[in-house]
């Protein structure tokens, strides 16, 4: 599989990657709203922001599960490459740095790119974005994850619904399974049937299992009905 690693001229981490001498293609658009169609899959390396400014390496699939959008379209999910995300995440966990490595729930755009896209990020403040040592370690983990993708062993491709945005459950499940879209608890009450179907279909490898993380019984009916009708086994946590 031909994986295109890209950065943005509008992103500080992209500029740190550039200073380190990597020759990845550079786009001139915002990382949440751009067009790109080269390669079989895409990896965007960029900044991560959070109000807590906690140092972290993060990875996620893009998409807007709800009616509001940050780049891309509302209620629209990008195509997920679960094996690629999982291979890179496993490589990230081996980085020799005492900072958090975690899988985030699906969020932000772009959503309409015709290829699978994975976001790999470092955060959560300018000090981290400009830290050449840590950014370099992250880039090398990405390259190693891409190199090992085809040999990455996954028992299942798994969807996760519920739980927090920073999914420690996904980070645990990724030890055995490939992680597809994660729809956090913040979207469950407004989750449309269309987005549930997209979370199943917008994948290059069709998910076979779904984990429901602390979703109240009153909010499960539509979700479990659609999952069951698509022959996806359901595990309640």
From Swiss-Prot:
<keyword id="KW-0378">Hydrolase</keyword>
<comment type="similarity">
    <text>Belongs to the DtdA deacylase family.</text>
</comment>
<dbReference type="InterPro" id="IPR018033">
    <property type="entry name" value="Deacylase_DtdA_archaea"/>
</dbReference>
<dbReference type="GO" id="GO:0019478">
    <property type="term" value="P:D-amino acid catabolic process"/>
</dbReference>
<keyword id="KW-0862">Zinc</keyword>
<dbReference type="Pfam" id="PF04414">
    <property type="entry name" value="tRNA_deacylase"/>
</dbReference>
<protein>
    <recommendedName>
        <fullName>D-aminoacyl-tRNA deacylase</fullName>
        <ecNumber>3.1.1.96</ecNumber>
    </recommendedName>
</protein>
<comment type="function">
    <text>D-aminoacyl-tRNA deacylase with broad substrate specificity. By recycling D-aminoacyl-tRNA to D-amino acids and free tRNA molecules, this enzyme counteracts the toxicity associated with the formation of D-aminoacyl-tRNA entities in vivo.</text>
</comment>
<dbReference type="InterPro" id="IPR007508">
    <property type="entry name" value="DtdA"/>
</dbReference>
<keyword id="KW-0479">Metal-binding</keyword>
<dbReference type="GO" id="GO:0051499">
    <property type="term" value="F:D-aminoacyl-tRNA deacylase activity"/>
</dbReference>
<comment type="subunit">
    <text>Monomer.</text>
</comment>
<dbReference type="GO" id="GO:0008270">
    <property type="term" value="F:zinc ion binding"/>
</dbReference>
């Amino acid at each position: 599989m031909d994986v295109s690693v890209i950065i943005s001229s509008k992103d500080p981490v992209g500029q740190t990657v550039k200073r380190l001498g990597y020759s990845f293609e550079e786009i001139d658009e915002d990382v949440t709203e751009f067009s790109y169609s080269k390669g079989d899959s895409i990896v965007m390396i960029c900044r991560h922001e959070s109000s807590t400014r906690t140092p972290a390496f993060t990875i996620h699939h893009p998409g807007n599960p709800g009616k509001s959008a940050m780049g891309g379209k509302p209620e629209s999910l990008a195509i997920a490459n679960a094996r690629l995300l999982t291979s890179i995440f496993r490589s990230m966990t081996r980085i020799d740095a005492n900072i958090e490595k975690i899988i985030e729930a699906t969020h932000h755009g772009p959503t309409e790119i015709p290829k699978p896209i994975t976001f790999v990020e470092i955060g959560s403040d300018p000090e981290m974005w400009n830290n050449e040592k840590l950014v370099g370690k992250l880039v090398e983990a990405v390259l190693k994850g891409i190199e090992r993708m085809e040999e990455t062993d996954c028992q299942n491709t798994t969807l996760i619904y519920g739980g927090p945005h920073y999914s420690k459950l996904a980070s645990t499940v990724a030890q055995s399974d490939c992680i597809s879209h994660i729809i956090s608890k913040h979207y469950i009450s407004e989750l449309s049937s269309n987005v549930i179907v997209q979370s199943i279909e917008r994948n290059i490898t069709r998910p076979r299992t779904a984990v429901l993380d602390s979703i109240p019984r009153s909010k499960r009916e539509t979700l479990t009905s659609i999952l069951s009708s698509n022959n996806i086994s359901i595990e309640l946590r």
